[in-house]
Amino acid sequence: MSPNKRILRAVYLSLFFIGIFMLLDDFLFSRKASSFMNEEIKFDLNKDFDIDNSLIDEDFTFNLSDNSEDINVDTDIYHATFATFGGNLISLKLKNHLNLDKKPTEIVKMHPQNQSLFYITLDKLSKSLFLYEQIDSHVHDFKTNVEVNGKYYEYIKRYTFSKSNEYLIKLEIFLNNIDVNDDIGIDFYKFVLNSGIEELSAKGKLQYNNYLSHAIYYDTKLRYGKDGLNIANPKWVGAGTKYFEVLVSKENMKVEFKHENKVLNAFILNKLDNKNVSDVFYIYAGPRDNKYLDIFNQRELNSFGLSNVEFGMSVEKSLLYFLQVPMQLIMQIFYNVIPNWGLSIMFLTIVVRILIFPLTFKSFRATAELSKLQPKMKEIQVKFKSDPKRLNEEMSKLYREEGVNPIGGCFPILLQLPVFFALYGLVNNFFVLRGASFIPGWIDDLSIGDSIYYFGYKVFAWTDIRILPFIMMITQLLSTIVSSNVSFKSLGAQQKFLYFGMPIMFFFILYDMPSGLLIYWITTNIFTILQQYYIKMNLSERRNK
């Protein structure tokens, strides 16, 4: 087999693995397949709660009363809106994180079905008008008194915002039976968390949002919600998107996932058996970023005194996380010098190429030496074409005598695959790349594909006209041609097809990939072209000497 065929096959193998990787990523992660959890940790709903399962199937939508008022609360990081009907949080905007329309991202909002992202159901108590009272700048109470079945209750919801600009809200529930000599008479209440986090741009497209999912962290494992799954005493349960999430932590909680109106909801079930009840929920509502999540693992790092909550486990870590950490560090160093994440990706690419340059140089030299052996190789192939075993033996003997490694030219190509996959995960999980502009007006966000025109509908499975995939395809073709040691005219039909076919296949596979990933690929191609010219000149000078 000729050296160029080996290299082309290595590239083809790389293409195959990239395609498989993209498909697996889309199937396993973007869709959050429920098969992730094979062994479920269950509790018996009837035994533990002594209630009718049919109660879980009730309609949890609520209509805001005409007498309801909106209460707006502002902190340095949040703009929150509460409704006095139900005392629910109906909108929560992140002031420091803007969407593509340059407006605060709304992480909690009312849905057309009159559902908030999370709310509490307590029979008639949940559908009452509450009185609002501001305790201080960070603590806000909603109170109501109501009669249920001849019994009178005082119901208080207390929302406490962080004084240290942490993305956490403490929700306290107080339920007091005014008839002190009587039991509460309510068996349980539910905290409902639905799949409602979205970011919409003016174009009407979901942004930064390659999945909407429920997750639960239990027994040191991250698991994904599915209909019918119930777990006792998890660390937290949450709903999230690519870059934002809402996580709920509570002591001794029991969680059930159930489809309601084709939407997966998580129900935190809480049994009541006292005359007076108080409960506490800690609700993280903010970026899916360890910078903000991990402070709740040590009580001295957060104003709520929380520890070992493990919110940071919601950020998935791939098998190549050990590569992503130094890559992220290198990007951060370059960004500190030149505050542009697009340039940081380009510099990271150059660093990677420099690190593997010794292998690349040896690879190219091995390919050149193999090209010189073509006459001898063809002679052996003709001589022993009817004896495959002897043919392989003679080829191996020739390689040993000439000191040539026949697969040496493949190593740099295959070595780049882990780097590519690691960067793919980094671009999808590195929060600072969200909304990071490289070239304003063209590449406005490195975490999504570039776009010069939005159709508003799908055209051949595409919604946008993008430029970077075309640049990638052209530079990939040039890189392949320059890396070859033979003239294009001498190539066979199959090799010509591989030369042109693979860049085109890469074009289709990577068309909708984040622009940060394509910048890495394009920079790699351009660097490879320049590098190959340098190597050829260097080898030419050595021959002349």
From Swiss-Prot:
GO molecular function: membrane insertase activity
Positions of disulphide bridges: none
Chaperone listed as a keyword: yes
A GO biological-process term: protein insertion into membrane
Transmembrane segments: 10-30, 319-339, 341-361, 407-427, 467-487, 502-522
Highest taxon in the source lineage: Bacteria
InterPro entries (alphabetical): Membr_insert_YidC (IPR019998), Membr_insert_YidC_N (IPR028053), YidC/ALB3/OXA1/COX18 (IPR001708), YidC/Oxa/ALB_C (IPR028055), YidC_ALB_C (IPR047196), YidC_periplasmic_sf (IPR038221)
Entry GO CC: plasma membrane
Protein's cellular compartments: Cell inner membrane
Keyword entries, A-Z: Cell inner membrane, Cell membrane, Chaperone, Membrane, Protein transport, Transmembrane, Transmembrane helix, Transport
CDD domains the record matches: 5TM_YidC_Alb3, EcYidC-like_peri
Topology versus the membrane: Multi-pass membrane protein
Entry-linked Pfam families: 60KD_IMP, YidC_periplas
Recorded family membership: Belongs to the OXA1/ALB3/YidC family. Type 1 subfamily.
Oligomeric form and interacting partners: Interacts with the Sec translocase complex via SecD. Specifically interacts with transmembrane segments of nascent integral membrane proteins during membrane integration.
Role, per record: Required for the insertion and/or proper folding and/or complex formation of integral membrane proteins into the membrane. Involved in integration of membrane proteins that insert both dependently and independently of the Sec translocase complex, as well as at least some lipoproteins. Aids folding of multispanning membrane proteins.
UniProt-recorded name of the protein: Membrane protein insertase YidC
Organism: Borrelia duttonii (strain Ly)
